[in-house]
Amino acid sequence: MLLGSVPQLDRVAVQLGPFPVYWYGIIIGTGVLLGLWLATREGERLGIPKDTFVDLVLIAVPIAILFARMYYVIFEWEYYAQNPSQIINIRQGGLAIHGGLIGAVITGILFAKRRGVSFWKLADIAAPSILLGQAIGRWGNFMNQEAHGDEVTRQFLEGLHLPDFIINQMYIEGVYYHPTFLYESLWNFVGVILLLALRKVNLRRGELFFTYLIWYSVGRFFVEGLRTDSLMLGPLRIAQVMSIGLVVISIIFIIVRRKMGQADKRYSEN
């Protein structure tokens, strides 16, 4: 379709009768499946049955989506209080990663306890998968033309040597914007490579997951500063506050668990 004279991508992938299927959902689903493949592959290498992560994903993903939506709605309550019918409409976006992460961690803890396996072992194995899903998922924001940054010129975007389809999609209502989705996606892809490399270092159990939290949070903090659609609490950007909190908590957990002897096992130990 066209917006002005700039060709753009349609956020609807296919129309099934009266029901549109959005790229957003397809991309999120692709991220989940690729992350699951990565986790089951590593899990089998470390003695975790393949169906463990399949079962976990079947439970955790719906709960994570629920928490992600609840988190988003809470901080946009002024709008949703006036439009309650839109609370359950997630086909075009409106999912907060930090909310989803909270839901996933709670589910993971309960799941691990019920299965009699170490939560930290599952979390370490899943860490690269989660970050991979986030890296891919940001392209859903791209298709929806959301989660972008401040206004820029086309010349600025061309100076980044971006392909035309990205530049054109960043043209929204007559204005070009920072492709913050791309910055975060690239940061996350680099993080996946880092986490896969750190597997070979054989960190203490739980520390690969904390490394994921630190890496993601550092990148998110800086990218969030460029965004124009941040969830706010007064003058504070919620994602930046959460990012700082996760970095601090992760470092404290690493130090305390080591001092208390709760991190004696290594990543690859059973």
UniProtKB/Swiss-Prot annotation:
Membrane-traversing stretches: 19-39, 56-76, 92-112, 116-136, 178-198, 206-226, 236-256
A Gene Ontology cellular-component term: plasma membrane
Key words of the record: Cell membrane, Membrane, Transferase, Transmembrane, Transmembrane helix
Residues reported to bind a 1,2-diacyl-sn-glycero-3-phospho-(1'-sn-glycerol): R138
One GO molecular-function entry: phosphatidylglycerol-prolipoprotein diacylglyceryl transferase activity
Biological processes, Gene Ontology terms: lipoprotein biosynthetic process
InterPro entries, per database record: Lgt
Pathway, per record: Protein modification; lipoprotein biosynthesis (diacylglyceryl transfer)
Membrane topology classification: Multi-pass membrane protein
Localization terms from the record: Cell membrane
EC main group: transferase
Major subcellular location class: membrane
Function: Catalyzes the transfer of the diacylglyceryl group from phosphatidylglycerol to the sulfhydryl group of the N-terminal cysteine of a prolipoprotein, the first step in the formation of mature lipoproteins.
Protein family according to the UniProt entry: Belongs to the Lgt family.
Name under which the protein is recorded: Phosphatidylglycerol--prolipoprotein diacylglyceryl transferase
Gene, per the UniProt record: lgt
